[in-house]
Amino acid sequence: MKTETTIQGLAASLNPARAARKIIGFVPTMGNLHEGHLTLVREAKKLCDVVVVSIFVNPTQFGPGEDFDNYPRTLEQDSRLLADVGCDIIFAPSVEQMYGTQPRLTNISVSQITDDLCGSSRPGHFDGVALVVTKLFNIVQPNYAFFGQKDYQQLAVIRQFVQDLNIPLEVIGVPIVRAEDGLALSSRNGYLTPEQRQVAPVIYQGLKQAEEQLHQGKDLQQVLADLKTLLTDNGFVVDYVEARQPNLLAASQFDRDIVLFVAAKLGGTRLIDNLQVAFTPQ
């Protein structure tokens, strides 16, 4: 396994694979890796000859007062984990390598599907994601890119700009990886105190309860209200509890498939989760 820190170095490492027409897979991360990230790498290994994992804490997707400065940088530990699952190349650039030293005048913005959910509470976040992922796609030039479905809205944004900008790759969404108690794996779970970690699985428990209620024919808006109450009663500060169609348009009682979304803070830690529900009205 190689580690490259410059765009030129990565290109040199990938040139032999390109010349041999090998299939290149790409997993973008911000490091502080967990089993969810490693699952993405394993999925990439199934489809691709060469797998590149980027580790870059991207400043443009953090808003004021968010955790950019405190976000864990664990490159040595991440490298060991990636070697164990067969990663071929780590790309770990500096901020200067990715953005240069001159003023940045170009932005990439995806409208409509970023207007609510995490987009309303984290203004500018998805613009930062779209910019850095586009830059990484241009640098790596993969055949496939792999993203977790925990960040469902982010995945939708990436699919949208890949389609709109004719970026020649396929985006693969990988199902959420959960702890045994149902909590969706996230690098930010490490911010939770032991007591908060015991409470955090209530999000998934509530989503599963909501799914069951929908299958029983309960009113969608009442189900969402009950889920919000459950979270509030357990100490969460709820950002949103929403239902959407898979394309992120507003969902109704009569849609056959919906996605339930939750974002809530537990102490100072913001947690997100979602559950896709195949729903047949009673």
Curated annotation (Swiss-Prot):
Residues at which beta-alanine binds: Q61
Descriptive protein name: Pantothenate synthetase
Gene Ontology, cellular component aspect: cytosol
Xref: HAMAP family: PanC
Pfam families noted in UniProt: Pantoate_ligase
Domain of life: Bacteria
Family statement: Belongs to the pantothenate synthetase family.
Subcellular location: Cytoplasm
Main localisation: cytoplasm
Catalytic activity field: (R)-pantoate + beta-alanine + ATP = (R)-pantothenate + AMP + diphosphate + H(+)
Single biological process term from Gene Ontology: pantothenate biosynthetic process
